[in-house]
């Protein structure tokens, strides 16, 4: 914009200055390419992780309990295998 001071009344120089200013403003408005990775880092930082396991005693007893183990042949095999190994707790 320093050349505007030299040719103050020239219409061509004034239009070039206005166009170049608008071009710069539009590039700043769209965002520079080197600022894009920062946006992706910010989005990934806010995600909560590690809270998938929410224990429930009822579900644990229904899936791995004594009644469920004895209700299927594979469950009986699990109980016998644990007895053979010497486990104190055979099921939940």
UniProtKB/Swiss-Prot annotation:
Top-rank lineage group of the source organism: Eukaryota
Molecular function terms from GO: structural constituent of ribosome
Feature: transit peptide: 1-46
Compartments where found: Mitochondrion
Record-linked InterPro entries: Ribosomal_bL34
Family matches, as Gene3D superfamilies: 1.10.287.3980
Main location as per UniProt: mitochondrion
Keyword Transit peptide applies: yes
Keywords, in A-Z order: Mitochondrion, Phosphoprotein, Ribonucleoprotein, Ribosomal protein, Transit peptide
Modification Phosphoserine occurs at: 71
Subunit (UniProt): Component of the mitochondrial ribosome large subunit (39S) which comprises a 16S rRNA and about 50 distinct proteins.
Protein name: Large ribosomal subunit protein bL34m
Lineage, uppermost ranks: Eukaryota, Metazoa, Chordata, Craniata, Vertebrata
Gene: Mrpl34
